[in-house]
């Protein structure tokens, strides 16, 4: 039977399929898993520079009066700390404090009419859900523009990202801090450029029209930038201790459980959806926590593998891989708070057998070249 909902394709699909046939469906989109090979792509980003088509990500632009004030009631982070040209990584919460999605809020200042302009980047698989939630909770007078299928988004990541991108724009990108962003002229078009990424390295995410996006992909390729797929994107983010929505967090886990307590600013902001639950958890503690894990054997702990203590199932692995950089099997998983201390030894069940695993810091790898 034919698929009634065929996978979506990004504007770069034809260019990408000239470079690889290794594709998969992710978040409703047909995306490349790898090009030359996962290890080669991973190493390129860690040591030089790689590029990712991330056009499948959701892209919303909100315009109107008091846009940030309206968003304040939907996230636990204090958006009053934002200034034009800066961004905040945060989460949308439901009434139970569960994470609807993790997002980035970009404050683009005011337009010539004096209206606030805010860009939101959200996960591909949750774009429809997020849009519905936002439209239900934001004031009607705020203009909501969904550019998810209208714009290309390319991530240029790695220590040489600045060297590659700088000659293409007039502004001094070296002065842009982490989570800083600006609009720059590129091929006679305004490009949105942010110093953000999902790899643990320095890098930029560039949003442009499909026409310019195709030229940009080809330009980067001509400069020797390695095209990278979802496989390397996953190993890179896991080494950097970055959670993946739908695996490491979902609408039943709170930010305090998911290791995102630094996003919760209870003392400096007013009410927001889910505040009561987070206030209670902050006061009394959480029952489970997302932790970093390192295998003591050569096995790899994968998503949904049970975590045991003294033979009893106590938790679950949410993400796991063999780290190309560290040459160790690493993972993220939820365990009871009393078993979440660094150094705690546990077991994981792999295909019916148990192997040793220990709790470590979630930041498995830290780049020395990434701007702070």
Swiss-Prot record:
Gene3D superfamilies: Aminomethyltransferase beta-barrel domains (3.30.70.1400), Aminomethyltransferase fragment (4.10.1250.10), Probable tRNA modification gtpase trme, domain 1 (3.30.1360.120). This is Aminomethyltransferase. One of its GO terms (biological process) is glycine decarboxylation via glycine cleavage system. Keywords: Aminotransferase, Transferase. Disulfide bonds: none annotated. The keyword Transferase applies. It comes from the Bacteria. Belongs to the GcvT family. GO terms for molecular function: aminomethyltransferase activity; transaminase activity. GO terms for cellular component: cytosol; glycine cleavage complex. InterPro entries: GCS_T, GCS_T_bac, GCST_C, GCV_T_N, GcvT/YgfZ/DmdA, GcvT/YgfZ_C, TrmE/GcvT_dom1.
